[in-house]
Design a protein with these regions (language model features):
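Non-transmembrane, aqueous-exposed alpha-helical and coiled segments at domain scale
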Residues: 121-155, 159-173
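Active-site-facing alpha/beta catalytic cores
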Residues: 1-129, 171-172
Length: 173
């Protein structure tokens, strides 16, 4: 309760400061609403398909389960059902890229998922771990850049950095 009270007080102080500086929240629409985006792995295709809808104006298909869905390391291979599903929707897409991904395979997947090379469509999420990132990531970055694919690079520092306990549970430091 004390922590909440402290946070509420700090927010109040920030709002008072903004008012003192002449910032009026009633005039600035940016201070009246919040853009909120969600993302998750499109792992369970029956779930994703049940939440996929056709846009009535454009006829394009969108997965309404999230703003961006991503494809994981184990389902990210050419001709997989997951790639086929992702290819058919208009959502921004993420794709995990780790030590098992070869450059040729990545380039083929990018051609499949974003043949028009639309900027902002694909986010590549590195998941190498601290001990493999220097060997694996630069080759992928060079190949993608050389082919001119407009991707966003993102890092998932949790994946690839696991420690397995004696009981077999995976933990992350």
């Amino acid at each position: 309760a004390d922590k909440f009270s402290d946070i509420a007080d700090r927010i109040g102080e920030a709002l008072d400061f903004m008012e003192a500086c002449g910032v009026d929240p009633q005039v600035l629409p940016q201070l009246q609403r919040t853009s909120f985006y969600t993302s998750h792995e499109a792992l369970l295709l029956p779930y994703e398909q049940a939440l996929t809808r056709r846009d009535s104006l454009t006829g394009d298909w969108y997965d309404c389960s999230a703003h961006m869905v991503w494809i994981g390391d184990r389902t990210r291979f050419e001709n997989s059902a997951h790639i086929e599903f992702a290819r058919g929707i208009g959502n921004p897409l993420g794709m995990k890229c780790g030590p098992s991904l070869e450059t040729d395979a990545l380039l083929k997947l990018l051609d499949t998922l974003n043949p028009a090379r639309e900027p902002g469509r694909i986010t590549l999420i590195s998941r190498f771990g601290h001990n493999k990132v220097e060997d694996g990531l630069p080759r992928l970055v060079r190949a993608v850049k050389a082919e001119g694919h407009p991707v966003v690079w993102s890092c998932d520092p949790m994946h690839g950095n696991v420690v397995k306990s004696d009981s077999g549970y995976k933990t992350r430091p």
